[in-house]
Structure formats: C-alpha cells, structure tokens
Design a protein with these regions (language model features):
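Oxyanion-hole/transition-state-stabilizing segment in secreted/luminal serine hydrolases
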Residues: 65-79, 92-128, 148, 152-156
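A short helix->loop->beta-strand "cap" motif at the edges of active sites that frequently abuts
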Residues: 142-146
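Catalytic His-Asp segment of secreted/periplasmic serine-dependent ester chemistry enzymes
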Residues: 156-233
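Extracellular/periplasmic catalytic domains that process cell-envelope and extracellular macromolecules
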Residues: 50-53, 74-75, 103, 141, ...
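N-terminal secretory targeting modules
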Residues: 1-57, 73, 228-233
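Catalytic nucleophile-elbow at a beta strand-turn-alpha helix junction centered on a G-D-S/GDSL motif
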Residues: 54-70, 88
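Conserved beta-strand scaffold positions in the cores of enzyme catalytic domains, especially
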Residues: 59, 80-82, 184
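Charged helix-capping and loop-helix junction motifs
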Residues: 125-134, 164-169
Length: 233
C-alpha cells in the first residue's frame, strides 16, 4: 500500500511538471516570433530541392494544419502546399509570411490559426486585428490571390474559450464582407454534434483532430474550392 501511494504521488508530480513545461513552452512561443524557426527552415530546405509551381493553394497555420496528414491526398485534384507549423499564433504566421506564403505566388491561401492565441489569453479583438494585418499584407503583395479564413475550431480541451472564439469568427466574417477576395468558411461547425457541443472527432488530448475530424474539414472545403477554381477539376 505504501509503495502504491508513493508511486501515485510520483506520477502526479510528473504530470504536474509536464503540464508546467507545456504551459511554459506555449508562453515562450507566444512571446517569440521566431520560435518555430527550425520548422520554417525545413520548409525552405525542401523548397531548395524542388520549389513548388506558382498558382497552387497554400494551407498555412498552426498544428492543426501541420498534423493534417490527409490534406494533400484528400484535396486532389486541387494542388496543395502544406505549411502548418508548431502551435503557431497569428504573430508567427505574420512573422514568416514572406517565407511560407508569399514566395509561392499562390492562387489561394487557406489559413487556420487563432485558437492558440485565444488559449494563451489574447482577446478576440487582438486576434481579429492580426487577421486584418494578414489580409492586408497578402492583398498588397498578391492582389489577385484569394484568402480563405477557416473559422475557429471548437474543442473539448478549450470549450471554456468557445464564446471568445466565436467573437473571433465575427471579425473574420467582417473581413470577408469587406474584401472581394476574402472568404469565410465555418469549418468549426462541422465538428459539433446535434447538441452544439464538440463531437467525437478529437484525439486523446481533446484538442487536435482525428481522421474523422479532418475528413469533415475536407468534405466542407473541397467542394467550395473546386467550385471557385474549376480549372483544377
């Protein structure tokens, strides 16, 4: 009994330490625009070997884009450049925009980011303003490139933040209303059940999507993108 109690205490301590390290890592990422430099260099090294053809569709954003293993195959025949990295905030996307979006001269950019921003305590207005900067910069450099804004992702792990994320969605909707080349897609709605709560489409952490979750995203986005870009059909 004593050994069992001692082991339990050790396990609890280890879990507490791991959670503390995770929170510290997230805070460091939020405060350092170049936090994901190593991942960006991986993209650039791959580009140095074979640079993507212009006119494709770039998916950029945080780990939900990075872990989207079925993206390229699931979106065929749409040509996809996948540029998700780490637990990125919009600040990280803006910091690396000249390296992971603009050089490819894409036909369209699909962006999913923002949930980590809200999770770290940033306000919906702050996140919305950063999205506006993103749109302005892409539009200034690539005026004919479409920008697709994926809605915030509801999740079990951050359900307490959902009302704030919905406020971010309102900022994104407004951006789409103001710009003819900007579109808002409510992909987050595909992850909710009939009761309006997160469905069983997440891995063990309750935050990242499982295969079913990504399939729902593909089933939502692919027809919309093909309708907009019939040349890829």
């Amino acid at each position: 009994m004593k050994w069992g109690a001692g082991l339990l205490c050790v396990l609890i301590l280890l879990v507490a330490v791991m959670i503390g390290l995770l929170i510290r890592s997230q805070n460091q990422a939020a405060d350092q625009p170049d936090y994901f430099e190593e991942e960006i260099l991986v993209f650039e090294n791959a580009d140095s070997v074979s640079f993507p053809e212009p006119g494709q569709i770039v998916f950029v954003g945080s780990s939900s884009v990075r872990f989207w293993d079925s993206l390229t195959e699931g979106m065929r025949p749409l040509p996809i450049i996948q540029r998700g990295f780490g637990g990125a905030h919009m600040e990280h996307v803006l910091h690396n925009l000249d390296r992971v979006v603009l050089p490819y001269a894409p036909r369209a950019v699909v962006v999913f980011v923002g949930v980590n921003d809200i999770g770290s305590g940033k306000t919906p207005t702050h996140v919305g303003n950063n999205f506006r900067i993103f749109v302005d910069r892409v539009s200034a450099s690539l005026p004919q490139t479409d920008i697709w804004l994926m809605s915030m992702k509801p999740s079990k792990a951050r359900w307490d933040k959902w009302s704030l994320m919905r406020e971010v969605n309102e900022h994104l909707i407004q951006l789409a209303r103001e710009n003819e080349h900007v579109f808002f897609e409510d992909t987050g709605a595909t992850l909710l059940n009939s009761q309006g709560t997160p469905d069983d489409v997440y891995i063990f952490d309750g935050l990242h999507l499982n295969e079913e979750g990504y399939t729902r995203w593909i089933n939502h986005l692919k027809p919309v993108l093909l309708a907009r870009y019939p040349e890829f059909s």
